[in-house]
């Protein structure tokens, strides 16, 4: 049985564009990245489920429910940070519910692999208050 990953493109719809800079909206960047990563994973035998494939809004509770009801093995949510200070968030950061077990190890491995491709590793941080991390039953 193939590994199942739910991929969430953070933000979406007219109510939640995420970070915006000079007309560029985070929700669109997240969707493009989610679809590209999902395609690569699918081509390599992973069963991919998307929380959204178009510009729609879902609450974090709905996103967690999709992952839980689909019986996903892993949940991956893409976001992009922004700051008025140049290059403050230039790199990759992974957020997990806590720093134990598979979730933390997987996040470190993802950051490391992206680091090998030239991305700055901004680390792995515990964020137990985030609904999609608190409500999903998988790493």
Segments predicted by a language model, with ranges:
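Short glycine-rich His-centered loop
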Residues: 2-23
């Amino acid at each position: 049985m193939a590994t199942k990953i739910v991929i969430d493109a953070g933000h979406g719809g007219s109510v939640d564009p995420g970070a915006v800079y000079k007309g560029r909206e985070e929700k669109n960047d997240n969707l493009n990245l989610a679809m590209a990563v999902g395609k690569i994973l699918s081509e390599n035998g992973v069963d991919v489920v998307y929380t959204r494939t178009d510009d729609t809004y879902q609450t974090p509770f709905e996103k967690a429910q999709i992952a839980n009801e689909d019986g996903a093995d892993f949940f991956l949510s893409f976001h992009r940070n922004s700051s008025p200070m140049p290059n403050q968030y230039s790199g990759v950061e992974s957020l997990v519910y806590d720093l134990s077990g598979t979730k933390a190890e997987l996040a470190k491995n993802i950051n490391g692999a992206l680091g090998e491709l030239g991305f700055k590793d901004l680390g792995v941080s515990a964020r137990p208050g985030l609904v999609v991390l608190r409500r999903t039953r998988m790493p």
